[in-house]
């Protein structure tokens, strides 16, 4: 019996061990081949912000040169779809320890499903990467050239963004309330800033276009 007591750790010890493996929730969720980030949150956010400024500034400049007749609102729509293109495709641009991989792991603090091959998230991100990403890039061309299909395509892509976001929220809330599964860490900013605010943008802006 003494041997069994020594060989079998108590529940608190087991939970502590699991917490030490990775910081994601729910506690004990299996994250295959997890490697902790070697960059701080400040470094990741700084690089992300700088990257957005460079990409969007270059897009604004090129759009102004290619189509000087565009009004300010149309240029802002071009910036949105440019940002959409890079947002939808950045997860395929490298391994887990490159810049984008580490950003993705930081975001996963608010939703660990992105690191566990969750069926819904996997299917949703595949659809967005295959369809909404390239179509967002095509939208930039349609706006600049004033193509007659600009508004129909804009409606389709915007509806797809809203629909995907609503399902994203709904599936997470369903698991939380009906299965008692929480994918977000308990700190408030992970839920309100990462999970809620950063995704709510993809409902508000497409809905106002």
What are these regions (language model features)?
Residues 3-121, 126:
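N-terminal helical submodule of small eukaryotic multi-pass membrane proteins
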Residues 72-101, 105, 112-209:
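Eukaryotic polytopic
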């Amino acid at each position: 019996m003494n041997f069994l007591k020594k060989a079998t750790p108590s529940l608190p010890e087991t939970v502590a061990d699991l917490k030490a493996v990775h910081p994601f929730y729910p506690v004990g969720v299996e994250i295959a081949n997890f490697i902790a980030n070697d960059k701080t949150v400040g470094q990741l956010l700084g690089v992300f912000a700088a990257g957005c400024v460079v990409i969007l500034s270059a897009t604004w400049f090129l759009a102004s040169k290619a189509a000087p007749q565009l009004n300010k609102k149309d240029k802002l729509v071009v910036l949105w779809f440019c940002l959409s293109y890079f947002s939808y495709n950045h997860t395929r641009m490298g391994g887990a320890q490159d810049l984008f991989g580490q950003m993705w792991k930081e975001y996963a603090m608010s939703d660990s499903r992105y690191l566990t091959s969750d069926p819904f998230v996997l299917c949703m991100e595949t659809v967005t990467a295959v369809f909404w990403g390239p179509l967002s890039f095509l939208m930039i061309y349609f706006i600049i050239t004033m193509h007659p299909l600009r508004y129909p395509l804009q409606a389709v892509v915007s509806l797809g963004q809203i629909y995907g976001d609503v399902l994203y929220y709904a599936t997470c809330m369903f698991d939380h309330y009906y299965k008692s599964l929480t994918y977000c860490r308990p700190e408030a900013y992970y839920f309100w800033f990462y999970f809620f605010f950063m995704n709510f943008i993809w409902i508000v802006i497409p809905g106002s276009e």
